[in-house]
Regions:
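C-terminal transmembrane helical hairpin of 12-TM major facilitator-type secondary transporters
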Residues: 59-110
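A membrane-interface helix-boundary motif in multi-pass transporters
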Residues: 164-182
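Residue-level signature of mid-helix packing/kink "hotspots" within the transmembrane helices
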Residues: 39-47, 156, 160
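Extracytoplasmic gate region of multi-pass secondary transporters
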Residues: 1-43, 107, 111-112
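A late C-terminal transmembrane helix in Major Facilitator Superfamily
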Residues: 125-170
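Helix-to-loop junctions at the C-terminal end of transmembrane segments
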Residues: 45-58
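Intracellular juxtamembrane helix-capping segments at the cytosolic ends
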Residues: 105-135
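Multi-pass alpha-helical transporter architecture, strongest
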Residues: 177-202
């Protein structure tokens, strides 16, 4: 699932990036004062993401979360110091917090998407109450549970991914890489899960 990849440059990634960027690009501001806000907002947004996905559909909400993250990171880039400009910390922080919220919403919608995708794949054309339906339902639960666990596990790599990325690339270049990644995920999610006639609508 493309939406599984949300968790690589997503909430955990942002949780690693925000304190690093405050420390290196806005050293006059305290990391301890601001770094906790983003993860807290992201955690609250997860519930909202699941609820909204129930109303609008998981794929649609996941795409909107990718759009929100891309727009937020472009805002972060805009407010970073560049050249002789010292940057704008309030704008930087607001955009970064918006990225956390968008990622949290995508987190919630992705976990709503996963079982729907497997149900659509395995139960299509089967009659409820038949042995075939029962076997397919059990297979659906097994596979969706495994993918859910795998998806959650990906998040842990964010804490390794960010320091390695910033050690090898300029901050602005890395951020533009995030934007490109989100655009790619939008296209993949739309093609496989959201468009009319999609392979696995969710």
């Amino acid at each position: 699932m493309a939406s599984d990849l949300l968790f690589l440059p997503g909430e955990a990634c942002f949780a690693a990036a925000l304190p690093m960027l405050i420390k290196t690009t806005f050293p006059d501001y305290s990391v301890a004062t601001y770094a906790w806000i983003g993860p807290a907002l992201g955690a609250l947004a997860r519930w909202a993401g699941g609820w909204i996905a129930d109303k609008l559909g998981g794929a649609r909400v996941t795409i909107l979360s990718f759009i929100g993250m891309a727009a937020s990171i472009i805002g972060v880039i805009t407010f970073l110091p560049s050249g002789g400009d010292g940057g704008n910390f309030p704008g930087f922080l607001a955009c970064f917090l918006a990225a956390f919220v968008a990622s949290g919403i995508g987190n919630g919608s992705t976990f709503r998407q996963i079982p729907v995708i497997f149900r659509n794949q395995h139960l299509k054309g089967l009659t409820e109450g038949t042995p075939e339906y029962a076997r397919a339902l059990k297979q659906t639960e097994t596979e969706s549970g495994a993918v859910t666990g795998f998806t959650a596990g990906i998040a842990a790599y964010g804490f390794f991914f960010i320091p390695a990325l910033f050690a090898n690339f300029a901050v602005t270049s890395a951020m533009w890489g995030f934007v490109g990644f989100y655009v790619t995920c939008i296209a993949i999610t739309w093609w496989f899960y959201a468009r009319k006639g999609a392979e696995s609508p969710s």
